Amino acid sequence: MNHLFNEIVPFGQHLARVANGWDGHPGLIAFGCSLGALHAANLYLRRPDLFNGLLALSGIYTASYGFGSYMDEVVYRNSPVDYMANFPSDHPYIPLYNSQRAAICVGQGAWELPESTRQLKDIFERKGIHLWVDIWGHDVNHDWPWWYRQVEYFLPWLLGERAA
């Protein structure tokens, strides 16, 4: 994970600055679908100082899905439901989360598993973290056509082009 935070993210920021002629800090949004949603959420939740937003679609945010009751430090640090449940309510990242645009979305249709998204939503509410957690209907499946629609829906908001 340190390789991502210390090398890949700064390199991506450098490329964005060079390609666009920007000065300063270009915004990065952590984004992913399915397993990529877990990775995006994990990156953003662990280092919101490196990202300007999050869009996580149809993820499973608990390690118990793949590891059952097994837990060690590596598994814990990659299981947002577990580490966010223990996140201090006065952590300095909370104002940072609350000042950025971040959305986690899941459907309730075929192949979707919304329970860990609901768990994260409850944890965020208890901690005063105001991420947009959106649970779509029973017709929304774990599949590319729905993710395409969700990106179209959330992207203008993430870019500040419309209100939530």
Language-model segment annotations:
Residues 1-164:
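Non-catalytic cap/lid and distal C-terminal segments of serine-dependent acyl enzymes
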